[in-house]
UniProtKB/Swiss-Prot annotation:
Disulfide bonds join 172-242, 178-222, 376-445, 382-426. GO terms for cellular component: cell surface; plasma membrane. A motif (ITSM 1 (atypical)) lies at residues 599-604. This is T-lymphocyte surface antigen Ly-9. Self-ligand receptor of the signaling lymphocytic activation molecule (SLAM) family. SLAM receptors triggered by homo- or heterotypic cell-cell interactions are modulating the activation and differentiation of a wide variety of immune cells and thus are involved in the regulation and interconnection of both innate and adaptive immune response. Activities are controlled by presence or absence of small cytoplasmic adapter proteins, SH2D1A/SAP and/or SH2D1B/EAT-2. May participate in adhesion reactions between T lymphocytes and accessory cells by homophilic interaction. Pfam families: Ig_2. The ITSMs (immunoreceptor tyrosine-based switch motifs) with the consensus sequence T-X-Y-X-X-[VI] present in SLAM family receptors have overlapping specificity for activating and inhibitory SH2 domain-containing binding partners. Especially they mediate the interaction with the SH2 domain of SH2D1A and SH2D1B. A 'three-pronged' mechanism is proposed involving threonine (position -2), phosphorylated tyrosine (position 0) and valine/isoleucine (position +3).
């Protein structure tokens, strides 16, 4: 080793002696200090040497290489290196020079002024580190060595049940394995069981245990650790994996039926003795352990709260299990184990709890009706909302064509058109209730016979309406005929008397005015002046034409004419309190040959109901037209006045 040091020293100092022209200042310039430091590292300068210090660091964390230098020591400089790399040069008062740029930002001097602090650790940082310490007034260099190990932080371990071996004594042997994700370097394990003295620190990740149904189902926990971290698993109860033990051949189990939302009791009918250790109820694979006060729970550390704690209880008298306010998830297998101090083989009783919902009223629907060759076919479907798969259906009248599908009952019905089809009743059943619904089949398929009956009934109704209408029409006509006869029998003068000039009137009364019962009034007569034969013949011809026109109009309207005076008619209408007058021009009632200047018209509205009528412009059954001819004011000779009679005025009452 001394020869090696001498060789490296000669190789380092040789070039300096071969260049006498270089001054001493040039030789010991600061630039040459760094190569000199590397040479000293390679030479392994003699000094005090100590065994390596092992340091553990967490991946991504930080470590401190502590030198533990006395405060009284005077340090010239410290060289830090990680062979074959030089890391840093540290001078007094925390002055540090980073020699490897790959460590920029990761290296700094700690609080004591000399120790090295490294952050953001990576896997490649693992290895050996050296510190060369040079003190003032000390000839030898002190070396200190460190060994750095980098570990990952452990994640939460998990317990895996690798195997379960059931036995005939209602017990199982379990093999548990504790696993941790990530690296497993230097990871050790330990196992604990709650409320027991089981504590294994052998470092094995495997545990083999045996447990009986009568043993308390206490949870197991696995703990894993390495030099930089530790973590524990969630507690695991292992009896839930012992499914084979509860399938042991015993006496036939009992089926108990419960109703959703109502209480149920699983009767054990057991009397405890001194030898009885405890009674364990198991639902599926969850253990329900009895407590002294009678409450039942699956885990003392996870007791249900509030009403849920009181929902499942065991009886203090016979250890029966009582469940209130049943839920659908309560259905399943239950096992009662009676454990004894004298025997390790407990007695067991099995129960099967079924939970059903009270059925609602079923609904019956029909498919579109299909008709072919006089055969009517339809499919009726009966279903219950929320009934589940345990619902059965029956049809009344009994039918053999019902088919169950997806919780519904489908009934195929076919019959000939016109055949009487009864109403169908669908009844839904389950073990705790039943409910029925009736479907009326009277209108689902109407055949020709039913259509014939329908049209016949409709025809009879129409005939009845026609008879009633005819009866009222005949009655009305009879009343009108009676009125016409009464007016025909009224007294009519043999010849129409002449009235003075400007006062001749002719009245027309409608046969519809049954209420207008006015007797004919005798008109006042005035002597008619004599005239010559030509004038009389002309007047007679004009009068005959006027009578013919008026009788023709009256006959076309089926009216009766009567000759009364204008004053008498007005007096009669005024007496009834039903008269209104309005000047109108009935163009469709008066001959157009008459001079408009010589005619005046009034409208008399008659309300046969006794109410005050409104003036009407349109002709109706309550209107009486009265026409009065004005006397012409033409100059006539005395002879013409004596011979020509005045053209009579007339009134038309309709």
């Amino acid at each position: 080793m001394a020869d090696l040091k001498r060789y490296w020293c000669d190789w380092a100092l040789g070039p300096l002696s071969e260049n006498p022209r270089m001054s001493q200042q040039q030789i010991f310039s600061p630039i040459l200090w760094i190569p000199l430091l590397f040479l000293l590292m390679g030479l392994g300068a003699s000094g005090k040497e100590t065994p390596p210090t092992v340091i553990s660091g967490m991946l991504g964390g930080s470590v401190t290489f502590s030198l533990n230098i006395s405060k009284d020591a005077e340090i010239e400089h410290i060289i830090w290196n990680c062979p074959p790399k030089a890391l840093a040069l540290v001078f007094y008062k925390k002055d540090i020079t980073i020699l490897d740029k790959g460590y920029n930002g990761r290296l700094k001097v700690s609080e004591d002024g000399y120790s090295l602090y490294m952050s953001n650790l990576t896997k490649s940082d693992s290895g050996s580190y050296h510190a060369q310490i040079n003190q003032k007034n000390v000839i030898l260099t002190t070396n200190k060595e460190f060994t750095l190990h980098i570990y990952e932080k452990l994640q939460k371990p998990q317990i895996i049940v690798e195997s379960v071996t059931p036995s005939d004594t209602d017990s199982c042997t379990f093999t548990l394995i504790c696993t941790v994700k990530g690296t497993k370097d230097s990871v050790q394990y330990s196992w604990t069981r709650e409320d027991t003295h089981l504590n294994t620190y052998d470092g094995s990740h495997t545990l083999r245990v045996s447990q009986s149904v009568c043993d308390p189902d206490l949870p197991y926990t696995c703990k894993a650790w390495n030099p930089v971290s530790q973590n524990s698993s969630q507690p695991v109860r292992i009896w839930q994996f012992c499914t084979g033990a509860s399938r042991r051949k015993t006496a036939a189990g009992k089926t108990v039926v419960g109703i959703l939302g109502e209480p149920v009791t699983l009767p054990l009918e057991f009397r405890a003795t001194r030898a009885t250790k405890n009674v364990v109820w198991v639902f599926n694979t969850s253990v329900i352990s009895q407590e002294r006060r009678g409450a039942a729970t699956a885990d003392s550390r996870r007791k249900p709260k509030g009403s849920e704690e009181r929902r499942v209880r065991t009886s203090d008298q016979d250890q029966s299990l009582k469940i209130s306010q049943l839920k659908m998830e309560d259905a399943g297998p239950y096992h009662a184990y009676v454990c004894s101090e004298a025997s390790r083989d407990p007695s067991v009783r099995h129960f099967t709890l079924l939970v059903y919902k009270r059925l609602e009223k079923p609904s019956v629907t029909k498919s579109p009706v299909h008709m072919m060759n006089g055969i009517c076919e339809v499919v009726l479907t009966c279903s219950v909302d929320g009934g589940g798969n345990n619902v059965t259906y029956t049809w009344m009248p009994l039918q053999n064509k019902a088919v169950m599908s997806q919780g519904k009952s489908h009934l195929n019905v076919s019959w000939e058109s016109g055949e009487h089809l009864p109403n169908f009743t669908c009844t839904a059943h389950n073990p705790v209730s039943n409910s029925s619904s009736q479907f009326s089949s009277g209108t689902i398929c109407s055949g020709p016979e039913r259509n014939k009956r329908f049209w016949l009934l409709l025809l009879l109704v129409l005939l009845l309406l026609m008879l009633i209408g005819g009866y009222f029409i005949l009655r009305k006509k009879k009343q009108c005929s009676s009125l016409a006869t009464r007016y025909r029998q009224a007294e009519v003068p043999a010849e129409i008397p002449e009235t003075p000039t400007g006062h001749g009137q002719f009245s027309v009364l409608s046969q519809r005015y049954e209420k207008l019962d006015m007797s004919a009034k005798t008109t006042r007569h005035q002597p008619t002046p004599t005239s010559d034969t030509s004038s009389e013949s002309s007047a007679t011809t004009e009068e005959d034409d006027e009578k013919t026109r008026m009788h023709s109009t009256a006959n076309s309207r089926n009216q009766v004419y009567d000759l009364v005076t204008h004053q008498d008619i007005a007096h009669a209408l005024a007496y009834e309190g039903q008269v209104e007058y309005e000047a109108i021009t009935p163009y469709d009632k008066v001959d157009g040959s008459m001079d408009e200047e010589d005619m005046a018209y009034i409208q008399v509205s008659l309300n046969v109901q006794g109410e005050t009528p409104l003036p009407q412009k349109k002709e109706d059954s309550n209107t009486i037209y009265c026409s009065v001819q004005k006397p012409k004011k033409t100059a006539q000779t005395p002879q013409q006045d004596a011979e020509s009679p005045e053209t009579p005025t007339y009134e038309n009452f309709t």
